[in-house]
Amino acid sequence: MQVLRLDRRHYKSGKIRRAMSSRIPGFYKLSVEERLKKVAEFAGLSDEEVKAVLSQGLPLDVADRMIENVIGTFELPLGIATNFLIDGKDYLIPMAIEEPSVVAAASNAARMARESGGFTTDYTGSLMIGQIQVTKLLNPNAAKFEVLRQKDEIIERANECDPMLVNLGGGCKDIEARVIDTIMGKMLIVHLIVDVKDAMGANAVNTMCEKVAPFIERITGGKVYLRIISNLAAYRLARAKAVFDKDVIGGEEVVEGIMLAYAFAAADPFRCATHNKGIMNGISALMIATGNDFRAIEAGAHSYAAIGGYKPLTTYEVDRKGNLVGTIEIPMAVGVIGGATKVNPLAKISLKILGVNTAEELARVAAALGLAQNFAALRALATEGIQRGHMELHARNLAIMAGATGDEVDRVVEIMVRDGKIRLDYAKEVLERLRS
């Protein structure tokens, strides 16, 4: 395997100078090796890290220790979204995804947002919720009173579980309690509000819930059953905003089309499901690339969207100049320590490419990516339709499935797109003609 030569001019004291721009015109036209060289120079990847990207990223012995009954590893394409300027910093965003056009769409949206200064973001903090279910209570409201009266004791007991987290400024910060009606009668639900710092937080929160459960049983006289983290991270929100200049994105008609598409999603849950799915295309791809629990992120996002009726996670408005202003608010329980983020070699490399060191920064980037992905989808729907870009890339997959290799792939795709026949049988027919 040929090892790429990295341009050491971009290094200083062994670290990359991140003054390089993520705006890389023609990046998609480069070969895989040329793209990786650009990324390696941007992120300061070592020769060993470059080799890991080009070879099997997850060794079988590591995979066998991660989950049960391992028989192999399953790979996804790893792409790079370019052009992202977030809070004044340039990012190349790694995305692991099988769906065509997602990476290209995000890059194009980021290029348009960049014309107006890129994305600005906000983060509410790394607070997670641990739930303790208290049942069999004669007087649920009296039990709630007792929990809140002794919340300092509960917090102290919870923090005994993780002195290191407490020393870092994290730990259990508050207690909430509420009585709910269920088909099994009234229950008291106690929430531990835990600052998990740079972790996703499941292990720390679950351990705390289990630790304080006996004490809560004792002071309430009830029976505790579930003691587990909630994936609705309502206190761990990431927000992003971007202004899309009307002239850059195609004019007033495009702005109106996007606003009409947004209005459709805000009024109709059938459309809204697809609207929010498009947001998660980008975010989940980033989560997979960085070794985060994308199922937890998906669950939290859709649950948050459903509070008060299922609604879009993004909003769009038109400013006084006629430009489109997009915003997003989404729960973002991500981590940069623990779990697969430090076990999977490619996850570690993805975090290095991204250049983030904290969960907060990763959450901010994810929110910006989700907004970019959603804007790109709405713009495509409001103009040429989503299928054009999808089908051109789908044609490439079909050409490969038909057996095309090397330059044959481009020729088969060109003919299928020209003839408007994006089908596997036609791909095979075209390939047969080319080879005859």
Curated annotation (Swiss-Prot):
GO MF annotations, alphabetized: hydroxymethylglutaryl-CoA reductase (NADPH) activity
Active-site residues, record numbering mapped to chain: E99, K277, D293, H390
Native source organism of the sequence: Archaeoglobus fulgidus (strain ATCC 49558 / DSM 4304 / JCM 9628 / NBRC 100126 / VC-16)
Name this protein carries in UniProt: 3-hydroxy-3-methylglutaryl-coenzyme A reductase
Gene: hmgA
Catalytic activity: (R)-mevalonate + 2 NADP(+) + CoA = (3S)-3-hydroxy-3-methylglutaryl-CoA + 2 NADPH + 2 H(+)
Pathway this chain belongs to: Metabolic intermediate biosynthesis; (R)-mevalonate biosynthesis; (R)-mevalonate from acetyl-CoA: step 3/3
PROSITE patterns hit by this protein: HMG_COA_REDUCTASE_1, HMG_COA_REDUCTASE_2, HMG_COA_REDUCTASE_3, HMG_COA_REDUCTASE_4
Entry EC number(s): 1.1.1.34
GO biological process terms, semicolon-separated: coenzyme A metabolic process; isoprenoid biosynthetic process
UniProt function note: Converts HMG-CoA to mevalonate.
Matches recorded under PANTHER family: 3-HYDROXY-3-METHYLGLUTARYL-COENZYME A REDUCTASE
